[in-house]
């Protein structure tokens, strides 16, 4: 942000959070004449002109629907244990909204009487190593969840690796986030059950649109919401093919 402001750029796209420091930086950039669009993470207390991201509540409902699909396929009367991994240092409310969406979907769209127990597990996201350690602690516990929901790419990759390392493939269903090559191949191997893919090309276009509208009219939409898609065994080959073409 400092480099962008010093350079006097015409606009700034930044992956933000709700920290006071980020609010001050965004406000300073706007005061200097550089409109700011927040991306992925928002800063609602700043003078940013727009936010481009995903609808956290709808994202949560989609995770909830995937849990219900897995519950319907289970042939057991035991409660289904679902763990949602939450970042300890995420300074925004998006995670809480996702969890609300999951809970609402489980309560409103449940078709059978299967009991689903949802718990939140706090992950130390100080760095990659701390995330890995937090997730490995889950697998050291004697009572493992039946389903783990990951709200970011790093958690998804770390849970996938832990499931393999602790020989839990087929015992724990992973609902991930994002569509890296590693995650897609894990779905192909049936280690990760499904992941949520964001239309990043659409997000980029929204960012440009927001800045252009702001320069042309002096204002723009406060929010742009990108499309999300569930990737699972039924369509993973299509996405792997797209990545191979891109390479």
Regions found by a protein language model. Name each.
Residues 85-86, 199-247:
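Hinge/cleft segment of the Venus flytrap/periplasmic-binding protein
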Residues 59-63, 93-114, 130, 134, ...:
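Short, solvent-exposed amphipathic alpha-helices that sit
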Residues 9, 48, 79, 144-145, ...:
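Local beta-strand N-terminus motif with an aromatic residue
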Residues 52-80, 97, 129-132, 179-183, ...:
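Hydrophobic alpha-helical segments within soluble ligand-binding/sensing domains
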Residues 22-58, 180-188, 192, 240:
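Flexible loop/hinge segments that line or gate small-molecule binding clefts
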């Amino acid at each position: 942000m400092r480099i962008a402001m010093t350079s006097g750029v015409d606009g700034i796209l930044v992956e933000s959070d709700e920290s006071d420091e980020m609010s001050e930086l965004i406000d300073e950039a706007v005061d200097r004449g550089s409109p700011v669009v927040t991306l992925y993470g928002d800063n609602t207390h700043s003078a940013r002109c727009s936010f481009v991201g995903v609808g956290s509540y709808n994202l949560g409902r989609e995770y909830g629907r995937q849990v219900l699909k897995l519950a319907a396929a289970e042939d057991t009367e035991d409660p289904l244990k679902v763990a949602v991994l939450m970042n300890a240092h995420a300074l925004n409310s998006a995670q809480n909204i996702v969890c609300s969406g999951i809970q609402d979907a489980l309560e409103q769209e449940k078709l059978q009487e299967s009991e689903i127990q949802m718990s939140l597990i706090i992950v130390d996201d100080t760095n990659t190593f701390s995330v890995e350690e937090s997730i490995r602690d889950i697998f050291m516990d004697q009572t493992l969840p039946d389903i783990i929901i990951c709200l970011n790419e790093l958690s998804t990759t770390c849970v996938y690796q832990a499931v393999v390392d602790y020989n839990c493939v087929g015992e724990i269903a992973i609902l991930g986030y994002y569509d890296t090559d590693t995650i897609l191949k894990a779905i192909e191997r049936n280690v990760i059950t499904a992941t949520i893919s964001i239309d990043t090309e659409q997000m980029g276009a929204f960012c440009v649109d927001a800045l252009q509208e702001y320069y042309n009219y002096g204002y723009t939409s406060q929010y742009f919401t990108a499309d999300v898609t569930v990737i699972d065994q039924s369509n993973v080959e299509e996405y792997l093919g797209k990545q191979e073409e891109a390479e």
